[in-house]
């Protein structure tokens, strides 16, 4: 968990982010500025950078590491419809970041989904990033019947997007969506670590927050911060200021030591609960990682943290909170040892299993 954070921050802090434009030159596609289209997954619709997760007002006082990670576009998705027969994208990756245990497509690629005739989102294809440059222009699908379709384009998980254009064949339309899916009025907010940010999905659509979004048909706000889910009160206040969330999921344990959890969680929770007195809050234990079968120190550390969270939550319930749900760590990955890349960060298999177990709980809380 520490390695992914260290690599991320070394890269982000070494580069001064500048608003750069995608390269649209000498290409057979016509390009449409995606900033004019609805953007899902952001709590900063009026930010100076269109594709950020955090409002500008937080920058001055927020920890620099946390702010930098907030410029990663995890969980962001552009919604549109088009009658294109060929569709692609052009975008500028803010940092051109790479890691040795996660694909470039997951880190800084894009992932295109289409709404099928049954109203389900299905993958169409990934936009793989240029290995050598910040700029990428690529075609995702060609030779389609030119009819109107609804699309959702997931953005990069571990890099930022400075500019983005939808590419189509000449004469094709790119318009705002007609289908109201996913539902946006009452988003699900999920806060957590590098796992929640999407480490190490092979492509953006395979992060469990994005899978859950498609499964439950509700917008999901991804507040995953690699190595930095430290229960910063700035994040608690941001969640508190979000109108009408349907469910709030708190999943920060892998980034916390037990004393930090015990000291910080009560105030973090109380800020959110004061603003949203009846919104269901779902507390998620640390996963029971595969290496815990062998590494006794890790087993003891995680078991202690999970027990501390259970005690805190029991206290909140005893104080009268009837809108709390608890998700045990053994249910995150189940019994399958093939669910991680490095004993911590999830494979696509791990993300699918996690989503399949967590989504029904969230859906029940929404209906409740």
Residue ranges and their predicted role:
Residues 2-10:
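Sec-dependent signal peptide recognition
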Residues 4, 14, 19-187, 366-367:
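N-terminal secretory targeting modules
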Residues 99-102, 198-206, 299-303:
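Glycine- and acidic-residue-enriched helix-capping/strand-helix junction motifs
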Residues 185-209:
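Catalytic nucleophile-elbow at a beta strand-turn-alpha helix junction centered on a G-D-S/GDSL motif
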Residues 200, 204, 212, 230-275, ...:
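Oxyanion-hole/transition-state-stabilizing segment in secreted/luminal serine hydrolases
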Residues 209-222, 314:
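Short helix-loop-beta junction
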Residues 289-327, 353:
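Substrate-gating cap/lid alpha-helix
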Residues 342-368:
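Histidine-centered active-site loop/cap adjacent to the catalytic His
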């Amino acid at each position: 968990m520490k390695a992914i954070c260290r690599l991320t921050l070394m890269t982000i802090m070494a580069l001064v982010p500048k608003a750069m434009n995608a390269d649209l030159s000498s290409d057979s596609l016509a390009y449409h500025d995606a900033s004019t289209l609805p953007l899902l997954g952001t709590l900063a619709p009026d930010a100076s950078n269109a594709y950020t997760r955090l409002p500008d007002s937080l920058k001055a006082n927020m920890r620099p590491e946390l702010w930098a990670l907030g410029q990663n576009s995890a969980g962001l998705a552009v919604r549109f419809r088009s009658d294109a027969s060929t569709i692609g994208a052009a975008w500028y990756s803010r940092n051109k970041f790479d890691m040795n245990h996660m694909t470039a497509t997951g880190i800084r690629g894009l992932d295109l989904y289409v709404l099928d005739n049954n109203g389900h989102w299905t993958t169409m294809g990934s936009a793989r990033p240029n290995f050598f440059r910040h700029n990428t222009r690529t075609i995702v699908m060609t030779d389609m019947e030119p009819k109107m379709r609804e699309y959702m384009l997931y953005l990069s998980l571990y890099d930022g997007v400075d500019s983005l254009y939808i590419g189509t064949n000449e004469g094709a339309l790119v318009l705002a969506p007609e289908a109201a899916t996913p539902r946006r009025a009452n988003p699900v907010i999920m806060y957590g670590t590098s796992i929640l940010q999407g480490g190490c999905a092979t492509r953006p659509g395979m992060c469990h927050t994005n899978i859950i979004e498609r499964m439950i048909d509700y917008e999901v706000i991804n507040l995953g911060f690699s190595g930095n889910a430290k229960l910063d009160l700035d994040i608690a206040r941001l969640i508190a200021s979000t109108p009408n969330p349907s469910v709030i999921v708190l999943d920060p344990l892998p980034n916390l030591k037990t004393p930090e959890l015990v000291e910080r969680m009560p105030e973090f929770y109380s800020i959110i609960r004061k603003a949203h007195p009846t919104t269901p809050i779902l507390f998620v234990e640390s996963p029971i990682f595969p290496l815990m079968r062998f590494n006794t120190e890790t087993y003891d550390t995680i078991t202690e943290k999970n027990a501390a969270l259970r005690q805190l939550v029991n206290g909140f319930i005893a104080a009268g909170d009837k809108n709390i749900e608890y998700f045990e760590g053994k249910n995150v990955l189940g019994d399958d040892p093939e669910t991680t890349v490095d004993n911590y960060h999830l494979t696509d298999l791990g993300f699918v299993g996690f989503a399949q177990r967590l989504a029904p709980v969230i859906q029940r809380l929404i209906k409740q």
